[in-house]
C-alpha cells in the first residue's frame, strides 16, 4: 500500500518518495517492521492467550524438562502470521501475482493450523483435526497454486532464444523472450535445468498438457510434504522458528538472484520477472520468525502450535515452487526432511518387527529425531541406535540443528555453481 502512496508522491516530486521504487529499501523496511511487530505485539498476544487459558497440554513422554512446559501458551503462530502480513501489505506491490500467492498461502494454512489448534485446546482433543482434513487443506492449496502458475499469463520465465542467419559468415544472435514453462532448477544437470515435460515424452501431441499435470501434482506433493515436515520439527523451543528463518534467508537470496538477469546468468538459473517482490515477502518472513524467537527461544514463553508450523512449512514450499527451486528442497529443508523420514522409518520398523517377532522394536530411542537426543541410551528402550548415551540438553540440540541448517542453506546456493 505504501508503495502506491509513495509512487504518487514521487510524481509530485516529494523528497525521498522515490526510495520506495527500490526493492532493497522496501525489503529492509519490511524486515524492520516485522521484527518490531512480532516483538511489540508478541507480549500482548501471549498475555491474551494466558488470560484465555490457551495452554499446551503435554503428555508425559519421559523427556527432560518436558512437564515444565505444561500450560505454556500455544497458537503463537498468530504472531508470525500478523508480522508477515502487515509488512508485506505495506511494502510489496499488491498486484504482483507471486505476492498474491504468498498472501493466500499464509492466510490459508494459518486458518488450517488455527482450526487444528482450536480443536486441541477448546475441544480437549490432543489429536486435533483428523489427518485426512489436514491433507485435504494442504492438497487444496497445492492445487490452487499449481493451477495459478499454469493459467496466469503473468507467470513466465525469460529464456535466451538462438537466432541463426545463414549469410556468407554465419551469424548467431540471442534475444530474450517470455515464455510459459514447466522447467525447474536442479544442480548437476545441463544448464541447471530440468523440464517436467521430459517425463511425459510418451504423451505425443498432449505433451505440454501432461507436463503441466505432472507439475501441478509435484506442487501438491511439495506443499504437503514440507508443511508436515515443519510440523514434525516443531518439538523443541525455537527449533522450527530458527530453522525456518535460516531457510527464509536462503530463499530470499535465491529470489533476488532469480529476478536479476545478471545474477541469474551467473548462476545459470532461470530469470523470473516479478520475483523481486518476493524478496520483500522473504524479509517480512525472516523478521517475523526471528522476532518470534524472542519469546519462543529456550525456555519458551509461547509455542507456535500448528497455526505457526503448518504455515511456515507451506510458505517455504510455495516460495520455492514459485522461484522454481522446489527440487532443491531436500538440501535446503534437510532438517524437515530428516525429521519426517525418522518418523516414517520408526513407524514402519515398529510395525514390521511387531508382525515378525510379536513385539515392536525401534530404530531411534524416540521419533521425531530431535527427541532421540533427549533420551538416555541403554535405559530399557530397545532401539537400534542407542548413541548418544547421555541426554543432550534441549538448547544444545536446537543450536546444533540450526548450525546444520546454515550449512545446508549455504550448500543449496553453492551447488548451483557446480558443473
Swiss-Prot record:
* Residues spanning the membrane: 22-42, 72-92, 94-114, 135-155, 210-230, 238-258, 266-286, 303-323, 327-347, 396-416
* One term of GO molecular function: metal ion binding
What role does it play? Catalyzes the initial step of the lipid cycle reactions in the biosynthesis of the cell wall peptidoglycan: transfers peptidoglycan precursor phospho-MurNAc-pentapeptide from UDP-MurNAc-pentapeptide onto the lipid carrier undecaprenyl phosphate, yielding undecaprenyl-pyrophosphoryl-MurNAc-pentapeptide, known as lipid I.
Report the GO terms under cellular component: plasma membrane
User: Biological process GO terms, please?
Assistant: cell division; cell wall organization; peptidoglycan biosynthetic process; regulation of cell shape
The pathway entry for this protein reads as: Cell wall biogenesis; peptidoglycan biosynthesis
Please give the catalytic activity noted in the UniProt record. UDP-N-acetyl-alpha-D-muramoyl-L-alanyl-gamma-D-glutamyl-meso-2,6-diaminopimeloyl-D-alanyl-D-alanine + di-trans,octa-cis-undecaprenyl phosphate = di-trans,octa-cis-undecaprenyl diphospho-N-acetyl-alpha-D-muramoyl-L-alanyl-D-glutamyl-meso-2,6-diaminopimeloyl-D-alanyl-D-alanine + UMP
Q: Where in the cell is it found?
A: Cell inner membrane
Per UniProt, what is the name of the gene that codes for the protein in this document?
Answer: mraY
Might you give the EC number(s) for this enzyme?
Answer: 2.7.8.13
Indicate what this protein is called per its UniProt record: Phospho-N-acetylmuramoyl-pentapeptide-transferase
Q: How does it sit in the membrane?
A: Multi-pass membrane protein
Amino acid at each position: 500500500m505504501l508503495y502506491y502512496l509513495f509512487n504518487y508522491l514521487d510524481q509530485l516530486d516529494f523528497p525521498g518518495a522515490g526510495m520506495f521504487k527500490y526493492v532493497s529499501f522496501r525489503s529492509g523496511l519490511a524486515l524492520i517492521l516485522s521484527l518490531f511487530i512480532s516483538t511489540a505485539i508478541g507480549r500482548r498476544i501471549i498475555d491474551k492467550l494466558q488470560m484465555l487459558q490457551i495452554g499446551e497440554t503435554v503428555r508425559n513422554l519421559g523427556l527432560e524438562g518436558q512437564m515444565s512446559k505444561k500450560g505454556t501458551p500455544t497458537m503463537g503462530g498468530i504472531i508470525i502470521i500478523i508480522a508477515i502480513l502487515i509488512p508485506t501489505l505495506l511494502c510489496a506491490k499488491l498486484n504482483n501475482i507471486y505476492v498474491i500467492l504468498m498472501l493466500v498461502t499464509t492466510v490459508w494454512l494459518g486458518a488450517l493450523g488455527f482450526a487444528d489448534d482450536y480443536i486441541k485446546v477448546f475441544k480437549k482433543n490432543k489429536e486435533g483435526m483428523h489427518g485426512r482434513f489436514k491433507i485435504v487443506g494442504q492438497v487444496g492449496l497445492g492445487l490452487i497454486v499449481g493451477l495459478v502458475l499454469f493459467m496466469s499469463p503473468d507467470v513466465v520465465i525469460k529464456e535466451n532464444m538462438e537466432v541463426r542467419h545463414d549469410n556468407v559468415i554465419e551469424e548467431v544472435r540471442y534475444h530474450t523472450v517470455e515464455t510459459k514453462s514447466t522447467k525447474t532448477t536442479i544442480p548437476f544437470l545441463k544448464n541447471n535445468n530440468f523440464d517436467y515435460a521430459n517425463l511425459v515424452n510418451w504423451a505425443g501431441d498432449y505433451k505440454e498438457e501432461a507436463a503441466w499435470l505432472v507439475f501441478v501434482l509435484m506442487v501438491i506433493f511439495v506443499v504437503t510434504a514440507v508443511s508436515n515436515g515443519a510440523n514434525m520439527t516443531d518439538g523443541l523451543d525455537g527449533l522450527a522458528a530458527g530453522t525456518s528463518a535460516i531457510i527464509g534467508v536462503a530463499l530470499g537470496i535465491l529470489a533476488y538472484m532469480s529476478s536479476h538477469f545478471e545474477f541469474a546468468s551467473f548462476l545459470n538459473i532461470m530469470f523470473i520477472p516479478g520475483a523481486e517482490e518476493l524478496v520483500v515477502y522473504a524479509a517480512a518472513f525472516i523478521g517475523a520468525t526471528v522476532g518470534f524467537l524472542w519469546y519462543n527461544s529456550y525456555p519458551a514463553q509461547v509455542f507456535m502450535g500448528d497455526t505457526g508450523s503448518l504455515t511456515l512449512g507451506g510458505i517455504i514450499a510455495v516460495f520455492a515452487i514459485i522461484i522454481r527451486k522446489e527440487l532443491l528442497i531436500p538440501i535446503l529443508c534437510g532438517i524437515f526432511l530428516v525429521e519426517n523420514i525418522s518418523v516414517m522409518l520408526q513407524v514402519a520398523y515398529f510395525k514390521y518387527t511387531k508382525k515378525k517377532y510379536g513385539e515392536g522394536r525401534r530404530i531411534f530411542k524416540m521419533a521425531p529425531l530431535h527427541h532421540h537426543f533427549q533420551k538416555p541410551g541403554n535405559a530399557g528402550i530397545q532401539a537400534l541406535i542407542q548413541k548418544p548415551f547421555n541426554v543432550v540438553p534441549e538448547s544444545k540440540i536446537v543450536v546444533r540443528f540450526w548450525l546444520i541448517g546454515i550449512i545446508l542453506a549455504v550448500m543449496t546456493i553453492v551447488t548451483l555453481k557446480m558443473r
